[in-house]
Amino acid sequence: MRVISGYLKGRNILGYNTPGTRPTMDRVKESMFASIQDYIDNSTILDLFCGTGSLGIEALSMGSNKCYFVDNGKEILKYLNKNIDNLNIKDKSIVTCSESLESILSSVPFILDTCQQIMSAQ
């Protein structure tokens, strides 16, 4: 795996093989980040089920200020922490090992134009 854009472009990301999981393919990352690239710069990112951190690292490479990485796999988070160290992004990374989340709450505003303001709020 590798970083596909931003200032870390071309840098390797350590992978981890575990049954039932697979890394996000480069073309999927390219499509995903192409659609949200205008919101990444100076943003704070939450990478749930982060694994080795491919998506959060990509966001940091593209200019995000901070990324919260959350996963329940203690072993895989060792690889994430190695990636964070190897890429020198520890100051922008917060890693949490959580066995479970009871709820994830998000209240979408009634006025959908407000979503744009929230996404671009600094």
Where are these regions (language model features)?
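Class I S-adenosyl-L-methionine-dependent methyltransferase catalytic core
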Residues: 1-122
